[in-house]
């Protein structure tokens, strides 16, 4: 058995300043840029995300014939709304090594190993709410704002806010208080067979994965003032089969030569989207809707 705790904390902050109109190109110093109104600009930002996880696993092995594993995770993500911050993800897997049964001894010279396996489990995902740099994209922050907006200089050259002497805050994205974990439920079964003292090994796997509350952006009308809106807006099914054959052609103390070949068949399909995905689910010039097969 095993239990554990994992804590992840990421904090990023940055500062930038820019200007133009410098008479010199050899010195990169804002002091040489133009002092005209609106030329020099400054900006700063900060961002933090935290993940707290509790997990455990219990394995059972009876005479290397009957195998059972139980796992459980509970994860909390700070950037999700408070009521949806935590997710629980269980899993179970089992295996039966037939080649260790007494009734298989008569064919052990040919069938050296045989195992049947199956598993079912849930996984949580929040990576869809982050961009390539690890920053949260639209729809998660209740207050995503831009700070010193509209800074300018008065007639005496003094820097002042542009809006009636006040520093305004501008909402950058619409909040989504219903955001929650993207969840995938996967069933998998298959077998592993070894022939002639495992000189030839055959592996077969079938899987069926059902993803719920999938992250995707919904395009909004231009008059709303926001171009898109991140939500848990659909269900997707992925299923397929994989077959692999391995031949251990040469096995000596100093040399090993192995040849493997594999093939796979996969089918992905959209199960559901709000309003059937039409007309507000154009994503990267690719229209998605209920029943459509994905490449």
Stretches with model-predicted labels:
Residues 1-293:
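Extracellular/periplasmic, surface-exposed regions of secreted and cell-surface proteins
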